[in-house]
């Protein structure tokens, strides 16, 4: 499997010369299973705009494009109206969520609301693509890859779910928008156990977290603790705070490497292969 990061920022997109090395687009990842010639998108932050253009090329052409959502906060869906394949009448697109305990509104309604005429010139039903809005339980197999979901500590309606993706090449665990309340969540440690790659929220410093407790995010130290205790091979910290510019993130990354050497911070365009 291969992961490519198209958006690594949390809360809202950022721009400016001081955000070029790590990137300013909000969360969007592409998972590629080369053996099955299949791709899956995780979340639709503003990074999905660039990805959408790439998916129009013959290299990436897919009969069905599946977008699997961890949750539906604005920074994880705000790029969807600018996703070029959604305007192709021949394109089939699956809008997918997992988690048997998830309590939330109708999925289609969430996307239709953000594209109402008061907010956007094109409404969901006028985009053109053939959409399927699908909900699954905690475990599902997609094109030979087993995907497991876990409810994370995220107090907002609909919650947020971590994802564990497994195939013959290895294991990728994605835990964005997770808050470890009263200590690191033991369920998440077990969920991430022995993963080849852990992608974990690290929006705040320890000092910042005191101010933003209850906002649904983690510190870098918490991400490192999960990685160590779960015995993961590689840790990528993502969901960077919009106030953290390149120099700030680079400094944080160096500190994190001292605690967990095989740790890096997500950057737009970064590709990681799991074998």
Regions found by a protein language model. Give the residues of each.
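Cap/insert and terminal regions of metallo-dependent hydrolase folds
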Residues: 171, 179-268
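Binuclear metal-dependent hydrolase catalytic cores
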Residues: 1-172, 189, 250-274
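Long, contiguous hydrophobic alpha-helical segments, chiefly transmembrane helices and signal peptides
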Residues: 72-74, 120, 152, 178, ...
């Amino acid at each position: 499997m291969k992961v490519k990061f198209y958006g690594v920022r949390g809360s809202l997109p950022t721009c400016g010369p001081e955000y070029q090395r790590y990137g300013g687009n909000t969360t969007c990842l592409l998972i590629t299973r080369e053996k099955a010639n299949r791709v899956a998108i995780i979340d639709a932050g503003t990074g999905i705009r660039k990805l959408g253009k790439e998916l129009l090329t013959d290299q990436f052409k897919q009969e069905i494009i599946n977008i699997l959502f961890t949750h539906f906060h604005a920074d994880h869906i705000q790029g969807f109206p600018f996703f070029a394949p959604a305007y192709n009448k021949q394109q089939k697109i699956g809008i997918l969520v997992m988690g048997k305990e998830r309590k939330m509104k109708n999925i289609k309604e969430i996307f239709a609301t953000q594209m109402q005429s008061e907010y956007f010139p094109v409404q969901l039903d006028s985009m053109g693509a053939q959409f399927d809005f699908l909900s699954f339980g905690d475990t599902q197999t997609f094109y030979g890859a087993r995907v497991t979901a876990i409810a994370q500590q995220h107090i907002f309606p609909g919650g947020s779910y971590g994802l564990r993706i497994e195939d013959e090449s290895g294991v990728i665990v994605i835990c964005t928008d997770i808050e470890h309340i009263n200590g690191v969540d033991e369920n998440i440690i077990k969920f991430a156990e022995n993963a080849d790659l852990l992608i974990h929220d690290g929006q705040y410093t320890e000092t910042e977290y005191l101010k933003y407790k209850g906002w649904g995010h983690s510190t870098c130290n918490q991400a490192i603790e999960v990685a160590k205790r779960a015995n993961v091979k590689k840790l990528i910290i993502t969901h960077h705070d919009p106030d953290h510019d390149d120099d700030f993130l680079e400094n944080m990354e160096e500190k994190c490497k001292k605690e967990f050497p095989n740790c890096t911070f997500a950057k737009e365009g970064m590709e990681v292969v799991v074998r």
